[in-house]
From Swiss-Prot:
GO cellular component, one term: cytosol
Reactions catalysed, as given in the entry: uridine(54) in tRNA + (6R)-5,10-methylene-5,6,7,8-tetrahydrofolate + NADH + H(+) = 5-methyluridine(54) in tRNA + (6S)-5,6,7,8-tetrahydrofolate + NAD(+); uridine(54) in tRNA + (6R)-5,10-methylene-5,6,7,8-tetrahydrofolate + NADPH + H(+) = 5-methyluridine(54) in tRNA + (6S)-5,6,7,8-tetrahydrofolate + NADP(+)
Functional note: Catalyzes the folate-dependent formation of 5-methyl-uridine at position 54 (M-5-U54) in all tRNAs.
Compartment list: Cytoplasm
Taxonomic placement: Bacteria, Bacillati, Bacillota, Bacilli, Lactobacillales
GO molecular function, one term: tRNA (uracil(54)-C5)-methyltransferase activity, 5,10-methylenetetrahydrofolate-dependent
Predominant cellular place of this UniProt entry's protein: cytoplasm
Entries under PANTHER family matching the protein: GLUCOSE INHIBITED DIVISION PROTEIN A, METHYLENETETRAHYDROFOLATE--TRNA-(URACIL-5-)-METHYLTRANSFERASE TRMFO
UniProt name for this protein: Methylenetetrahydrofolate--tRNA-(uracil-5-)-methyltransferase TrmFO
Amino acid sequence: MSQSYINVIGAGLAGSEAAYQIAERGIPVKLYEMRGVKSTPQHKTDNFAELVCSNSLRGDALTNAVGLLKEEMRRLGSVILESAEATRVPAGGALAVDRDGFSQMVTEKVVNHPLIEVVRDEITELPTDVITVVATGPLTSDALAEKIHALNDGDGFYFYDAAAPIIDVNTIDMSKVYLKSRYDKGEAAYLNAPMTKQEFMDFHEALVNAEEAPLNSFEKEKYFEGCMPIEVMAKRGIKTMLYGPMKPVGLEYPDDYTGPRDGEFKTPYAVVQLRQDNAAGSLYNIVGFQTHLKWGEQKRVFQMIPSLENAEFVRYGVMHRNSYMDSPNLLEQTYRSKKQPNLFFAGQMTGVEGYVESAASGLVAGINAARLFKEESEAIFPDTTAIGSLAHYITHADSKHFQPMNVNFGIIKELEGERIRDKKARYEKIAERALADLEEFLTV
C-alpha cells in the first residue's frame, strides 16, 4: 500500500490518541474532525477529546483495573494521560480533570504536532486505498454510520448513555454538606449531602414518578450498566441506589455534624456526593446521577437533595444513543478490520466502554496503523495486561451476546498457580505481572 500519510477520522479521545501515536512514530497524519463544520447535540465545544459525560477517569490505584490500564498507558506515552495529569482536580483516589482545561490541552498538543494536519470536515465514506483509523465515536454521523454498519451486513448495535447535571458551587448550601472521600482515601475531595431515611424515601418516591424525556418509539431502552440513568436504577428497587451512587458506607458523619440524622447512627442512611468539575472549583457534578428526566423534573427532584434546595443547574443531565460494532466478527485484536484491511477502528464504537478504555483502544490502533504503514509486524499486546485483555475481550467475546465492556480484572488472564484469596493482594500481583510483561513486550 503506497501512501505518504495515515488518515484518522474523529478527534475524540481515541482519535486524538491514535493520531498522536502515529505522528510520534514519524508518520504524517491527516486528522479529520467534523465539529467546527457540523456539530452534535451532545458536544458543547469544537475542542478535541471533549468529555460529554463525567469529568472522572475513575480510580487511579493499581489495585483497580482502570488504574492499571492508566499506568500502562503512561508507560506507552499516552497524550490523553499526560493531559489528564496536567489538568487534574481533587477527587480522592480517582483521577478527575477540569473538563475544559483537559480538552484544550489535548487539542493544543495534537494541533501543534508538526506531523499532524487537522482537517475540519465531515467524512461520509470509508477510504479504501489509504490506511485509516476510524474513531468517530458513539455519536458517528448518520452517513458514515451507514457505511460502518454495512461492514456488519447492515446490523448495528446501540445502547443509551447518559450524563449527570452540573451545579454552580455558589448555590450549594455548604451548611448541609461535609467534605470527605469514601474510606478517607486520598484527600477529602467530595462534598457529601447526607439523607435521613425519610428524606431518602421521599426522594425515591419523587424520582420514580418523575417524567422522562421521550425516546424514539421504535427503540428499546438498552443502557450500559456503568452509566445507567438514576431514575432507571431507582425503579429496579427502593434500595438499589443505596448500593450504587447513594451508598453511605465509608462516608460517616464528621464529629462536628449538627444536621438531621436518624438517631445516633454514625453513618447516614444515604449520601449524595458532589464532585468538583473544573479546576477553579466553581462547578460540581452530582456523582452517578446520569439522567434522562425532563429538565423541569430534574430541577424539581434534585432540589430535594439536602444542600441543593436552591441549586442553579449550569447543565442539566442528558442522554444520547450510542452505536457500537460487532467487534468479535469485524475486528482483529489489533483493532484492524477483517473485511477491509486498510481500516482500523477505535474508541467506544468498538465496544470498549469508558474514557480511558476509548483512549487505550486508540493507542493500540494508532500503533498498529503505524506498524502497517512501515510494513512491520502487528503488535498484539499480552492478555496479561489491561490494554491487551481489553482488545482480546472485544474481539473474542460471543458475538450473539456482545455488549460494551469496561476494563476489569475479570477479563485479564488469571494468575498461574494457587489462587490468592485476598482480593487486594491478588490484584496487586496481577498488576505487578502486567507491568513486567508490558516492559518485556516493549523490548522485543
